[in-house]
Structures are given as structure tokens and as C-alpha cells.
């Protein structure tokens, strides 16, 4: 099908000035990008060969947005309309984040990971987990099946690239317990990562405040990064602290990149908690110094103050060693429970970024156990006051009754830090959006319109052209996408049409599942998935694999 988009205000993703243009989509490809009126003013639809003409007067035409930190690994397959992302103009997502996802795995590792990140992605019992390798997972994305295992010929809603998750790899080789790898285990992890990248992963992620990935010392990570770098991939760490010692944690990651030659992409880069208020400039100075020395660094952020994670992440890492059953046993043992309380309330656990838990900042956003549903939307401190218990006792009780599956919002951010970092020359957008839970973080529905509406148009922090570049062309370059991420002839027809005067995020913390305003059309590989502001139900996304030439594109290697 050919679609002519006429009289659009083109913002092409390069950062160049906007211009008026006609753009012709021919199936999955952008066939023509010409001055406005060239196609629409002198030729009829029949003469251009267009099956449809969209008059885009007053609308901006941009590349589809690229979510550099997505947690849609399971939801792309389970809730296939994926309206949360399509409704905000996202056409490509980067999965496998924070060191924990579902490939590569063996049976035991998959069972442990499913339970561990149920608060991120849910854990459906009736779902067919019919892959074990990264290649098989990417094949599954390209061959979507219904829950009964029968193929329906559909596709996923967005395009998706994948990071091999370091914590999952470590669990497969070493289990979920603490400890340093033997030389043989180190080599085995590197071999697993090499295989994953040869099957299409674009890099490696870590979650260094999540077990078991956080048990890795710098030397262990360096070996893994060398393998990733040799294959032209990048390292995307959720590093060891966004609170106490945050700058040292960033410096460790930058040092890894410098020493191993592996490109670095800092996940949800920010400076949180009271001690880091107003300190974003120190982080940016650290990054700029490394960039000037030739270190390859990019980063992503979400444009909100609270973070989102699991309640179990607040535990000290030693308390989570060995997986769910071992953790629950420690919470049930009075002596060990007292040690956990001391770590959380007196010293500040490594899981809580070295900061003493502030119970009034930890808001329950989702639970696995329906009996706990009444806690959603309340902080641990609120629940303690209502039930006349101590906050730590509430914390431990919820973890136990929900088998560590509780999701939370963590209200610890600073607006001045968010604004400073989003203006940096390495910045890209990443929602870090969790799509499950009764009251998930609104960033899952609002990240990209919030950048364009609130921060660009309303506050003027970035020009429209700069903002679109941050959300499309720049992340496409980091991912080494082949002919994708710009509005240019011969590129993939992933495009968005939005009203620059009305685009805004509508999702709030009270009502988080609200579609954005102002996005009129979204095309994924040339197929309209949002049409006139409404979802079409079409799914046209593809798995995007790293190929042997170093570029990332659809299709087998």
C-alpha cells in the first residue's frame, strides 16, 4: 500500500531545521521525501500511485520514537495491542534491560527469573515459554502465537531489539547465589554472551542493584564487556547506586568502557535521593571528560521524578542470595530478619542504593497476591499507620505474602537533575515503563509526549528538532539501525504525525493508563497502527537483530 503524506512539517530526526514536505510511503519503505507541493500540489493521488492521501497541514512528521529502556519483553507477546507504546509514537523498543530477562536460559534459570521479575512483567502460568536461547526468543517475536500455542500469522506491535541480560547469564552459569566465578565459569559466561550476540543481541545489560547481577565485581564485568566490545555491541548498565556513592558508581562504568573498549550506554541516568539534589552537573562533567578522551558514551532518561522497581530490591543483596525461597526463609528467621532490618533502616542496603529506607517514599504500585490489592497506591508508611505496625514489619509482611512480587514507585528524584541531564549531547529517551500492576508508573504511557509537550514546547528546554533527534536519530545511531530512525528515502517507514500545539502526556500517577493527546498517526513498517488518533489493531513490528556486518536490522543473520 502506498500512502502520501502531504504538506507536513518535516522534522527528520537528524536535528536539522524543520521544513515543509511531502512524503510517500510505499509498503514498509519511505519512497520519497520532497518539498511540499511537489507531489500533492501538481499530481493527483492516482498519478503518484498513492492508495491514500493524508493532508498533514499543521502536523509534524517525524521518525517513530525509539524507547531505549523498555520492559516489554513479555507484554509484547501477552498483551499484543501494546497501546501504551503505540499511542505515544513508539515504533522501536530495546528489551532485555537491567540484567534480567527471559533469554538465554535453561529451565531452572527461567523459573527463577520469571518469579524474580514478576513485579516488572507479571508471570502468567498459562503462557507458552517455548524458547531458551536469544535466537529462539527473537524468532518468537517474529512468529507471534496465541496463548494456546497456535500461530495466528500476526506480528508484534513495535520493532524490538534485545540486550543479553548479564544477571540472567550469571544465574544460568552460577545460580542465584553470591560468589566470584572460577576461571571456567567466567569463560562460560563470556561464551554464552558471545553466542547471544551472534544470534542477534545488540549488547549486554546489567542490573547492579538487583541479584544475582550485582554480585559481579568489576573484573568479572570487564571480561564480559570485552566480549561485547569485540562484537561491536554496547554495555547498558543499571549501575551500583543512584544514591550514596552515585558518582563513584558512574565512574566504575565509565572506567569499564575506557579499559575494555566496549561502548557504554548509561541506563536511566540520574542522580536521586536527598544527597544528590542539584548534583547532575558533576555527573555530566564526568561524562564530558570521558567523551573528550574518546570514550563512547550515550545515556537515556525518563522525564519524571519517581522511579519504579520491586519492593524486594530494597533488601540487602546478601538477603536475596539463592533466590526466592532462600530469601523468604531469611525473612521468616527472627535473627536474620533483625539483620535485614538493621541493613535497611540503619546502614542503608546496597539494594536501596546505600540509602536508609525512607518508608514514605515507597509506594505500592502492583501486587501478585489479590489479597494485598488494598495496599496499592499507599506508601509503606501509610500502611503501617493504618495497621498500627512498624514500617519494617509491613515491608517484610508484604514481601512474604506476595512472594517478592510487589511493584513499587520510589519517590526520590529531583527536577533540576532531570532537566540538566536531558539537555546533554549524549541523551536519548527511555521510558523504563512497567506495563503491569494496578497503578504502574505513568512513564509507560507518557514518556515521549512529555518530552515533546512539557519539556520542549512548554518549558523550552530543547527545540522541537533537538527533542525529536534525542528520541529517534540519536538512539538509532547507538543501536546501529540499518536505514531506520530518520525520515529519509529508502529508510523504514516508521513515522509519527503529531500536532505540536496539543501533544502532551495525559497519564498521571492517579490514572496512569491514559493515552497521550495530539498523536494522530503512527506507522510501523508502513502499516498504520494509529489512524486519526485511534488504534487500528494492526501489528507490524519485527525483531531487529545484530548482523555480522555490525548493523541491526530485521531478518535472520
Residue ranges and their predicted role:
Residues 195-253:
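Divalent metal-binding pocket/active-site signature
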Residues 333, 420-426, 431-432, 496-542:
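C-terminal cap of metal-dependent C-N hydrolases
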Residues 1-3, 10-64, 79, 505:
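Histidine-rich, glycine-flanked metal-binding segment
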Residues 11-22, 406-412, 418, 459, ...:
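Acidic, glycine-enriched loop/beta-strand segments at the rims
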Residues 8, 28, 58, 69, ...:
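Divalent metal-coordination and catalytic microenvironments
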Residues 74-163, 182-199, 222-230:
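Alpha-helical scaffold segments that flank or form the walls of functional sites
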Residues 137-141, 147-173, 179-183, 189-210, ...:
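Active-site neighborhoods of metal-dependent hydrolases
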Amino acid at each position: 500500500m502506498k500512502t502520501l503524506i502531504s504538506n507536513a512539517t518535516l522534522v527528520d530526526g537528524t536535528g536539522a531545521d524543520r521544513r515543509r514536505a511531502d512524503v510517500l510511503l510505499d509498503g514498509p519503505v519511505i519512497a520519497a521525501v520532497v518539498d511540499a507541493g511537489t507531489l500533492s500540489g501538481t499530481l493527483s493521488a492516482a498519478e503518484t500511485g498513492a492508495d491514500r492521501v493524508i493532508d498533514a497541514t499543521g502536523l509534524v512528521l517525524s521518525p517513530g520514537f525509539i524507547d531505549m529502556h523498555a520492559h516489554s519483553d513479555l507484554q509484547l507477546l501477552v498483551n499484543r495491542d501494546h497501546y501504551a507504546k503505540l499511542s505515544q509514537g513508539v515504533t522501536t523498543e530495546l528489551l532485555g534491560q537491567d540484567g534480567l530477562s527471559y533469554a538465554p536460559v535453561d529451565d531452572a534459570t527461567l523459573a527463577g527469573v520469571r518469579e524474580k521479575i514478576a513485579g516488572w512483567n507479571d508471570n502468567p502460568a498459562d503462557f507458552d515459554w517455548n524458547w531458551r536461547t536469544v535466537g529462539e526468543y527473537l524468532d518468537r517475536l517474529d512468529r507471534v502465537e496465541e496463548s494456546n500455542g497456535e500461530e495466528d500469522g500476526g506480528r508484534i506491535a513495535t520493532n524490538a531489539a534485545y540486550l543479553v541480560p548479564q544477571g540472567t547469564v550469571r544465574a544460568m552459569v552460577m545460580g542465584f547465589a553470591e560468589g566470584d566465578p572460577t576461571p571456567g565459569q567466567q569463560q562460560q559466561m563470556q561464551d554464552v554472551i558471545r553466542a547471544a550476540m551472534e544470534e542477534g543481541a545488540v549488547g549486554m545489560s546489567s542490573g547492579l542493584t538487583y541479584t544475582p547481577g550485582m554480585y559481579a565485581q568489576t573484573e568479572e564485568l570487564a571480561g564480559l564487556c570485552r566480549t561485547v566490545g569485540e562484537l561491536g555491541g554496547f554495555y547498558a548498565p543499571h549501575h551500583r547506586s543512584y544514591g550514596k556513592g552515585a558518582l563513584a558508581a558512574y565512574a566504575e562504568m565509565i572506567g569499564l568502557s575506557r579499559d575494555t573498549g566496549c561502548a557504554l550506554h548509561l541506563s536511566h541516568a540520574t542522580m536521586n535521593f536527598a544527597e544528590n539534589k542539584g548534583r547532575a552537573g558533576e555527573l555530566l562533567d564526568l561524562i564530558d571528560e570521558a567523551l573528550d578522551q574518546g570514550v563512547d558514551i550515550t545515556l537515556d532518561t525518563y522525564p519524571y521524578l519517581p522511579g519504579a522497581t520491586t519492593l524486594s530490591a530494597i533488601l540487602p543483596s546478601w538477603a536475596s542470595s539463592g533466590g526466592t525461597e532462600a530469601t523468604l526463609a531469611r525473612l521468616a528467621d527472627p535473627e536474620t530478619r533483625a539483620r535485614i532490618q538493621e541493613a535497611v533502616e540503619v546502614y542503608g542496603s546496597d539494594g536501596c542504593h546505600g540509602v536508609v529506607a525512607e518508608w514514605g517514599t515507597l509506594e505500592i504500585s502492583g501486587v501478585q497476591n489479590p489479597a494485598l490489592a488494598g495496599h496499592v497506591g499507599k506508601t509503606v508508611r501509610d500502611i503501617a499507620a493504618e495497621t498500627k505496625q512498624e514500617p519494617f514489619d509491613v515491608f517484610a509482611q508484604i514481601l512474604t505474602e506476595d512472594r517478592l512480587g510487589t511493584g513499587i514507585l520510589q519517590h526520590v528524584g529531583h527536577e533540576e537533575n532531570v532537566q540538566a541531564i536531558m539537555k546533554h549531547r549524549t541523551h536519548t529517551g527511555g521510558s523504563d515503563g512497567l506495563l503491569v500492576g494496578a497503578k504502574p508508573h505513568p512513564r509507560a504511557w507518557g514518556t515521549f509526549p512529555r518530552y515533546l509537550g512539557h519539556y520542549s514546547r512548554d518549558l523550552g528546554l530543547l527545540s522541537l528538532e533537538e527533542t525529536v533527534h534525542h528520541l529517534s536519530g540519536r538512539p538509532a545511531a547507538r543501536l546501529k539501525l540499518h536505514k531506520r530512525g530518520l525520515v529519509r528515502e529508502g529508510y523504514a517507514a516508521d513515522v509519527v504525525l503529531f500536532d505540536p500545539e496539543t501533544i502532551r502526556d495525559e497519564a498521571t500517577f492517579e490514572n496512569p493508563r491514559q493515552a497521550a493527546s495530539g498523536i494522530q498517526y503512527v506507522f510501523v513498517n508502513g502499516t498504520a497502527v494509529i489512524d486519526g488518533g485511534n488504534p487500528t489493531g494492526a501489528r507490524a513490528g519485527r525483531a531487529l537483530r545484530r548482523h555480522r556486518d555490525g548493523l541491526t536490522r530485521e531478518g535472520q543473520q
